[in-house]
Design a protein with these regions (language model features):
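Acidic, Gly/Ser/Thr-rich repeat motifs that build Ca2+-stabilized beta-propeller blades
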Residues: 1-155
């Protein structure tokens, strides 16, 4: 039986916002690794992935891709990151960015055994897209319940 969707009137929903972290400028995506650490990984448009733990940003980045990320104008730069469903065992994660040539790149990386740092030398390009325009490069990576990796693209 398919799931049933229901809507509640907005007046019945109690929503509140609380600032729990003042992240770095240009944060485009936030991900969790699903490894039980409760760390937040913040992807910044310039190509740096920062880690927040307990409401505090770590001084050292998780991964710095500024030497690979091209323009950070419009919908370009480091667009998204996602951790593999088996990240706790394999330490594999994916990033989606525009490179120095203007192409959109999906790349796989590995983290250190303790999960504290991403290894820039572990990069494996999975997909390169030559976009027809320099903007609307897309921007979201997700793993579905089926275990497949999904990415959105622009034009």
């Amino acid at each position: 039986m398919p799931p049933t969707l229901a809507a509640a009137p907005l007046s019945a929903v109690d929503l509140r916002t609380t600032l729990f972290l003042s992240g770095p400028p240009g944060t485009l995506d936030i991900a969790v690794a699903g490894d039980g650490t409760n760390r937040l990984y913040l992807a910044t448009q310039v190509g740096v992935i920062r880690v927040a733990e307990g409401g505090q940003l770590r001084a050292e980045p998780f991964l710095d891709l500024r030497d690979r990320v091209g323009s950070t104008a419009d919908e370009q730069g480091l667009l998204s990151l996602v951790f593999a469903p088996n990240y706790a065992q394999r330490r594999t994660f994916y990033v989606y960015y525009t490179d120095l040539a203007g192409d959109t790149v999906l790349a796989r990386y590995r983290a250190s055994a303790d999960g504290q740092r991403g290894d820039p030398a572990s990069a494996q390009v999975v997909l390169t897209i030559d976009p027809p325009y320099p903007n609307h490069n897309g921007g979201k990576l997700l793993f579905g319940a089926d275990g497949y990796l999904y990415l959105s693209t622009g034009d």
